[in-house]
Amino acid sequence: ILGMLVAEYLYKKYPKYGKHAPVVTLVPFRDDLSCARGDIPRAWFGSPLRGAFEGVDMLDNEWVSPNVLRIFPKRKFAEDAPLGSTYRLLHYYYGKSGIKMEANRHLTLENIDILSCRGHAIYVTGEQQFWQYINVNVRPPANDPLRAVSSTADHHHVANSKGFMKLLGCAFTMGNDDCGNFHDNSYFGKRGGDPCVLLPANLRGIGLFSPKPGEELELFQDDYSPANWRGKIVKIDGEKIFLDKPLPEQKGEGFVCFKTRYGTRNIIVRDCDFVRHTARGLLILAKDVTIENCRFGYEQHGSIKFETGYTKRQWCEGYGVDNAVVRGCVFRMCNISGRASQGFVRDIMLAAYMKTDPSDEQPACPIIKNVLFENNKFYDLHGLVATISGSENVVFRNNEIHAGGECGGDLWYKGGFAVIGGKNIFIVDNAFFGDVPFAGVIEKKGAVENLNASGNRKISE
């Protein structure tokens, strides 16, 4: 389901030669496939609205010979991609997925290897509750350059659940998107002419939210301040959601809508490896989360994001973050591509997104609360350890930050922290080893209440 065309022509005859060969993504990799590259352009040929599903054509192409495929991307990509570079070419993005689970309870998956699949390797939705993975691995066969990808989308994706999940001793690698995405689908809607009708304020409409009669909704204003309203769905008519009571006053462009029957929470991730993959390590849009003794490395866009948000074009995800701990983990060479947000390249990110993803705008009421990072080790940073905004009660303590490595870049703030907005933020008792360029904390004036940066120290190696 995938291919690599490189200067050495690994294929004498490509398996799809003479057949239709859709091209969805081109991701630059090191020649030895040890990790993605961030110094040359990548390309995604999907549509934000049509997606990148199986059977959707993305890019015109034609066969030149049994092992040469000519593609017709936009001119800029063709001009900027260096000759002789190694790219991982994928024919699919979303697809059938490897293992799909919906509304199971008390389920264990153990000693499973998913070598490759179209779409998410593992996909969870519905009222799934009380389940665990023990030694479940998403990784292609070792030492086979022709098997250059595991999952063509996320390694593990939770679209909705009722929580209580364990991920123990697992390894996720070489997929084409996030290692783990834990959230519940939300919805961005607005008042219609009828006060009991909710209309879409997002171009994707109700599809991913999948509302059903009888479900109860809880509404928030578009800055995540409470609307103090709950009501039930009476019926669905096209894109219209009919409710059992009038909607409250709409103070902005719409309402962020949660389904009360879902709540992805109580997650334990322990002794796992998240390495050598596209996109991010873990996206946590959940409550009551423990991430312990895990290893993150050689990641394209950063290791962990605590977030919740909505956009006006694409996705609306998460019911907020509360009570999360990241302890005893090792982070090495994360955010290879130098992905920046809110003006800084970073590894860890805590932020909401509103209307666009990412966004500088942050909620009036912090939606990310009570997060602790302690006793972790960071090596070979591209930029900051973390950016923090839209958050309340966040602590980074007793962590080690080490200089040096090959991640690249000479950013003046490498190794430090940026607090862009929030309340009760503590960066305390951390150790900066070696010649860390910036052993400090950046604070956005007027946007932070009660920042404590104390007890941090530099140690010569």
Per-range role (PLM):
Residues I1-S116, V124-T125, P140-V149, T173-R265:
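Extracellular polysaccharide-degrading/modifying enzymes targeting complex plant/algal/animal polysaccharides
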Residues A418-E461:
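Leucine-rich solenoid repeat scaffolds
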Residues K100, T108, D113, Y123-V124, ...:
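Extracellular beta-strand solenoid repeats
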Residues K96-G98, R118-V124, P141-D154, G163, ...:
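Short glycine/acidic-rich loop motifs that flank beta-strands on beta-rich extracellular proteins
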Residues I1-L10, F130-P141, A153, F182, ...:
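Extracellular beta-helix/beta-solenoid repeat scaffolds
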Residues G126-T173, D178, T311-R327:
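Extended hydrophobic/aromatic segments used for targeting, binding, or gating
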Residues I1-K12, Y93-N104, G119-E127, H155-S161, ...:
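Extracellular beta-strand-rich solenoid/capping regions of secreted or surface-exposed proteins
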